[in-house]
């Protein structure tokens, strides 16, 4: 169950960063987008208010959880789904992204550093 909960957290976290990256490329203000995400009932979630918002306010912000730990849990979910022959394209892609971040930035980095996949090129 822990791995499944962390998979939800991991997918919501990278989805928020991807949305912010696309909006930034479109010319939208990061703070305005973030406030809209927090206020909107359909996208209110813990990763946005407890991780993304503090990270955008202070790029030195950390959550205290290593990137490698979240990457491992997401891989467990993707591997479990594959072993059970479940259709799980989101878990597969989410696992690939977290594994890529782990390889690029190092597993000891904070999980919030996954944002660098989007913001180093935006």
What would you call each of these model-derived segments?
Residues 1-122:
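Helical "substrate-binding/catalytic lid" subdomain
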């Amino acid at each position: 169950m822990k791995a499944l909960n962390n998979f939800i957290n991991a997918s919501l976290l990278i989805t928020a960063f991807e949305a912010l990256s696309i909006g930034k490329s479109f010319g939208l203000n990061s703070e305005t987008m973030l406030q809209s995400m927090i206020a909107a009932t359909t996208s209110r979630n813990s990763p946005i208010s407890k991780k993304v918002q503090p990270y955008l306010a202070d790029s030195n912000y950390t959550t205290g959880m290593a990137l490698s730990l979240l990457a491992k849990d997401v891989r467990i979910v993707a591997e479990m789904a594959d072993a059970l022959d479940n259709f799980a394209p989101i878990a597969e892609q989410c696992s690939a992204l977290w594994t890529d971040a782990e390889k690029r930035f190092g597993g000891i980095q904070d999980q919030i550093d996954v944002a660098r996949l989007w913001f180093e090129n935006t």
